[in-house]
Design a protein with these regions (language model features):
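Single conserved hydrophobic/aromatic residue that forms the stacking wall/gate
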Residues: 1-5, 10, 232, 237
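Class II aminoacyl-tRNA synthetase-like tRNA-binding/catalytic domains
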Residues: 6-7, 11-181
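Long, highly charged amphipathic alpha-helices
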Residues: 87, 91, 190-197
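Metal-assisted phosphate- and nucleotidyl-transfer catalytic regions
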Residues: 114-119, 193-230, 234-235
Length: 237
């Protein structure tokens, strides 16, 4: 343990134990700083960091980021993305629990796809053909007869070649199914309620992460419903 003021060299990313007084500081990232009295080095890195993760942005190539992923994820902005992901899933779960839904967990390996189509990841399952599931749709429909309202948060897999940011081969799907509805408007109302709850939760509990990523969430008071008129034409004589 060294007293502050004595000569001491601390390497970047060393693990330290400090004693001091917490003081407000507007210029600090979290609004406060510690005025040190004592500091103790618990451990030092075995080698210099391959990335400057203490910077605001990594400013590295995608290849360098992925090759050093375990280290790159320690960057404050990289971490913030996973916190936002947590907030979205948390909001989905909390809202549906409040609406009387039951969470289910369905198989992801099956003999056939739940949605049909040919874009499947195929594999061998103990010498028998199988596929990775594209959707929990069949399982949700079965469980609605058990619990009336069910939801799942789980990965789905789609073997589709793409070149856009809006298509992924594997992603976390937020699915729900509900019985005893009068029409699709009931589904839209549930989705609107979730979006309102989730956005309010992110603004409240994940404000720092949103600030780090430069994200401004919209206000979702009411989502407009676009209706189409059905036109009837008499058959030609």
């Amino acid at each position: 343990t060294r007293l502050v003021g004595s000569e001491m060299c601390i390497r970047d990313r060393a693990t330290i134990d400090v004693e001091g007084t917490v003081k407000p500081e507007e210029r600090a990232p979290h609004g406060f700083e510690i005025r040190l009295d004592k500091i103790k080095v618990l451990s030092e890195p075995a080698a210099p960091m391959p990335l400057a993760i203490s910077k605001w942005k990594l400013n590295t190539s995608l290849e360098a980021n992925l090759n050093n992923r375990a280290i790159a994820l320690r960057n404050v902005r990289e971490r913030a993305k996973f916190r936002i992901q947590e907030g979205v899933v948390r909001g989905f779960r909390d809202f549906l629990y409040s609406q009387g839904f039951t969470e289910i967990h369905t198989p992801k390996i099956g003999a056939k796809s739940a949605e049909g189509g040919a874009n499947l990841f195929r594999l061998e399952y103990f010498h028998r053909p199988a596929v990775l599931q594209q959707s929990p749709q069949f399982y949700k429909q079965m469980m609605v007869g058990v619990f009336d309202r069910v939801f799942e948060t789980a990965p789905v897999f789609r073997a589709e070649k793409h070149n856009t940011k809006r298509h992924l081969n594997e992603y976390t799907s937020l699915d729900f199914e509900m019985g005893y509805i009068d029409g699709f408007e009931d589904i839209m109302a549930m989705e609107t309620g979730f979006l309102q709850y989730m956005i309010a939760l992110l603004k409240k509990d994940y404000a720092e992460e949103l600030r780090l990523l430069g994200v401004t969430l919209p206000n979702v008071d009411k989502i407009p419903t676009v209706r189409f008129c059905l036109l009837y034409t008499s058959p030609s004589p």
